[in-house]
Amino acid sequence: ALAISLMNKKDFKPEDFAKSHPGGTLGKRLLLSANDVMVSGNEIPIVKYDQLAKDVIKTISEKGIGVTFVKDQNDKIVGLITDGDIRRAIDKSNYFFDMTAQDFMSANFISVGPDELASACLEIMATKKIGCLAVMQGDDLVGVINQKDIVKLGI
């Protein structure tokens, strides 16, 4: 009771506690950003729009995130493909292995900026029932966040 009274008197907020204890759950929740938890650089799985389905599967398997992004002939990110997209495409087509990435990618994907709090990213993924988020800076893909990675951090 004395500690709470003192905290109230000094206007001590959760953010102040987080700064003093950045490794704790509250600290991580209030301080870690998308930039801190994202996979970036060569670790981001990317395929060209005209790559065959087998190449898409290979890329997703090699990177182990469960998703790959799709870029067009101008190297602009135009979509993403998840494990689920692959399963749905196989279920709908007898010619899946003749398909290219653009045939079964999701053009509308959810993204966040690199400064978005990791806890907010986790909330977005839970609300939208998705396992990953693109991290975009303008039109540039700078990273990808996997829900499992955030949960492992204790956020």
Question: Where are these predicted regions, by residue range?
Answer:
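Short alpha-helices
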Residues: 1-12
